[in-house]
Amino acid sequence: MNRRKSREVAMRLLFQTTLNGENLEEALENLKDVRESEEITKEKDYESVDLKDVDIDYVKRIIKGIEENKEEIDEKIKGNLKNWKIERLSKVDLSILRLCTYELKFEEDIPNRVSVNEAIELAKKYSGEKSATFINGVLGKMI
């Protein structure tokens, strides 16, 4: 199983729930239906994530952990934004920041630099170079 792909699925579920107000529990129930969304990628023929490579238990733990600690996670993000409000962040960037902030704060077995690097890679893939730099700066203040 692949942690990188698992993070990607978790980020996409977070994005989905942030975008359409769907309950995280519903999103987890529909995990088998996860498909690449044109709304979060610039490439229309982008490959979908193969769920056989995904650690579903890890994804569920991350999603549930973020849901249970969302206020604390968002406060941590807000405290590290400079000249930005959390409401102005793109939904993709917010999803990535929530995912990484959760890992930094609650997943002690994952080195901070790994979580930050994975967040930067997700930002490059789904949001762009400027977002990757922005996310790196925000997360760099947290560690």
Swiss-Prot record:
UniProt protein name: Transcription antitermination protein NusB
One Pfam family matching this protein: NusB
UniProt family annotation: Belongs to the NusB family.
Free-text function comment from the UniProt entry: Involved in transcription antitermination. Required for transcription of ribosomal RNA (rRNA) genes. Binds specifically to the boxA antiterminator sequence of the ribosomal RNA (rrn) operons.
GO cellular component: cytosol
Keywords linked to the UniProt accession: RNA-binding, Transcription, Transcription antitermination, Transcription regulation
SUPFAM superfamilies noted in UniProt: NusB-like
Record-linked InterPro entries: NusB-like_sf, NusB_fam, NusB_RsmB_TIM44
Biological process per Gene Ontology, one example term: DNA-templated transcription termination
Molecular function terms, GO-annotated: RNA binding
Domain of life of the organism encoding this protein: Bacteria
